Structures are given as C-alpha cells and as structure tokens.
C-alpha cells in the first residue's frame, strides 16, 4: 500500500500490523524527519506526479494532504492511476470552509487565507506551519463531489464526512451547509 503524503509514516504501524507492505511518499523532507529516522519504503516525491507505474498498489491512501497541494485533483487522479484494478483509493481532506479549514490559523481563515496568515504571524511572531497560498489551499466538498462524479477509472464506494456522526451524513446533499459543518471529507473508490 502507498501512503501519499505519509510524512515519517504516522500510519505505518497500523497498516503493517494488519499485514500491509507499507510505502510512504512525501515531498517535505522536514515532515519526513518528524519521527526521527526516515522509515524503509519511504520515497521523496510529489503526490501530483507519483513516481510509480500504473496499477502498482492494492491500496493508495492519503489523509489530510489534498489541501496542502496546489492542484489537489491532479494528485487524486495520480492516486487512482497507481491503484491496481480492483484496488482501493482512499482520500480524506480538510475542507476550507469547515471549522479547521485554516488549520492553526482557524477560525480567522473565514476572513481569507492571507488575513489569517498575517494575523497568526502578528500574534505568534512567526509564520504558521501551513502557509496560505504556499502549503495550504482552499479545497471544498463541492470540488471533491464533482471530481468523484466524473471518475471513469474508478467507482465511488463511499463519500462521508469524517469525524461527523452518522446521522449527519445527509448534510452532504445540502450545498453550502456541507462546506461549513463537514470538517473533513472522505472519498473511497474502487479502481475498475
């Protein structure tokens, strides 16, 4: 399995305990060093240009990375590309208009990413880790739903609001509301 944006392998132990052969890819060398030593099977590279052949992995997984790349749907397409036929692609990402869309600059991101970034710097004396326009971008549920709807290489198995109770899943059908009450969106696909 491939963990796109997996950093130093935060999910490595859970996946290997379940029997998976784990590979991680990350573009941020600083993030890769987060747990100390870079783990085996770790590749430095871009999620938007995965350095693997088509159909290389049974499971391609990404947790909270799409909002950190300038072209999230290019990354999502790359993830589907390297998933083998019958395999699973799992994406989850933080929605910009959700409560934590601005990450550490929340809730000030509701006034714009540039404002939130400047305010954070003024308050803390340094830039936030997630810099608006550089390493943090606006990604919405609407974009994810549109992307999933036009997939010709994979079928959608589930689209759910991560961290929300099951009774709230129907809110994804209400434009506008879904953007604010959904903290994080999960899209699960099976490659055709």
Residue ranges and their predicted role:
Residues 1-101, 187-191:
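Conserved SAM-binding loop
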Residues 70-78, 84, 88-190:
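S-adenosyl-L-methionine-dependent methyltransferase catalytic module, highlighting the catalytic core
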């Amino acid at each position: 399995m491939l963990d796109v944006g997996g950093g130093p392998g935060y999910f490595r132990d859970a996946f290997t305990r379940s029997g998976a052969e784990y590979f991680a890819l990350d573009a941020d060398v600083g993030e890769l060093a987060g747990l100390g030593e870079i783990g085996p099977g770790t590749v430095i590279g871009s999620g938007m240009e995965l350095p693997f052949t088509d159909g290389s992995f049974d499971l391609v997984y990404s947790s909270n990375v799409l909002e950190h790349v300038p072209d999230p749907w290019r990354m999502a397409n790359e993830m589907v590309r390297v998933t083998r036929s019958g395999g699973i692609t799992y994406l989850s990402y933080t929605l910009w208009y959700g409560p934590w869309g601005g990450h550490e600059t929340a809730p000030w991101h509701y006034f714009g990413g540039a404002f939130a970034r400047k305010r954070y710097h003024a308050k803390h004396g340094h830039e936030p880790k997630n810099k608006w326009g550089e390493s943090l971008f606006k990604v919405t549920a609407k974009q994810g739903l549109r992307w999933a709807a036009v997939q010709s290489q994979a079928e959608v198995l589930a689209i759910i609001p991560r961290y929300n109770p099951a009774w709230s899943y129907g809110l994804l059908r209400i434009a506008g509301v879904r953007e604010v009450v959904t903290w994080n969106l999960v899209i699960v696909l099976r490659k055709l």
